[in-house]
Amino acid sequence: MRKIITIGREFGSRGRELGRRLSEDLGFAYYDQEIISEIAKRTSMSEQYVQSIVESKPSFSFPIHVSSSFYQMSDPMYDHAMAVYQKQTLIIEEMAARSNCIIVGRCADYILRDRHPLRIFVYADMESKLRRCREKAPEDEKLTDKELRQKILDIDKIRAKYYEFYTGEPWGNKLNFDMCLNTTNVSIKELAAAVAKLYES
């Protein structure tokens, strides 16, 4: 059985950075945006369109885990969303079978639940997330603190809706994770080293 770590994260909490550091420390493959690229290759959709689907709040009334019988009507957006999620599931399962790996986001903790991955959720306080977003923002982005705070909240709300729609589980629920890490004022390099040491012990 391959060793797998999944990372869910709040926007701006440096979950991606932690994932990359862990992959270097453990020698594991790292998957994030690579999943989007692979979905695009296997469908007729562009990467930008696939990205827009996975970053959009589902507009359907019932979560997908309830029953597909609710969606007998023809709805192109629904069909595309389902096609993307099905490809995403297949690709994540293939990646997990191929080698030891770290997968960020994409409902990977749920998709791979039968493989018993180490499930990590990363969070931080709002001030820390604001600082991180400022550091990573394009030079031409001129958001006030209030606007940026709202952007962070909106992105996390979309992530929660997406996760809950496809899994039927609440996003970020600590009971669904093996490790919840607060990255506020923490060195990601040191945190990754500590997690890697704990994981290998």
Model-found features: residue ranges?
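ATP-dependent small-molecule kinase phosphotransfer cores
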Residues: 40-100
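Short, polar loop motifs at secondary-structure junctions
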Residues: 105-109
